[in-house]
Amino acid sequence: MECDFNEKYITKNKKFRNDREWDQFHTPANLSKAISIESGESLEDFLWDEENYDKEHVLEELADVMIYCIHMSDCLNVNLIEIINNKMDKNEKKYPVEKCKGSSKKYTEL
């Protein structure tokens, strides 16, 4: 499934936050903690049984993580799509297909 992540969703997210005056709480440290906490909450569904999990709950937590990532990029005054593309460019150099295809090794072990 293709992901159509664009400025419309980022704007909607910021408006939601700003309408509630929550931006005052969105420091890089608080947002970093929130991202970690929300991603940790998705792990609960996989504890003890990785095959039978509540997909709806996992998707809710994934959405929460993405929302906080949008807020973090706004707080740091960076373009989220641009930093994702920059990171992918770095990953392509660290993990060339011919060296890592089918491998779970870290780039330092390739």
Q: Language-model features: where?
A:
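Flexible "arm" and connector segments at domain edges
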Residues: 1-62, 66-110
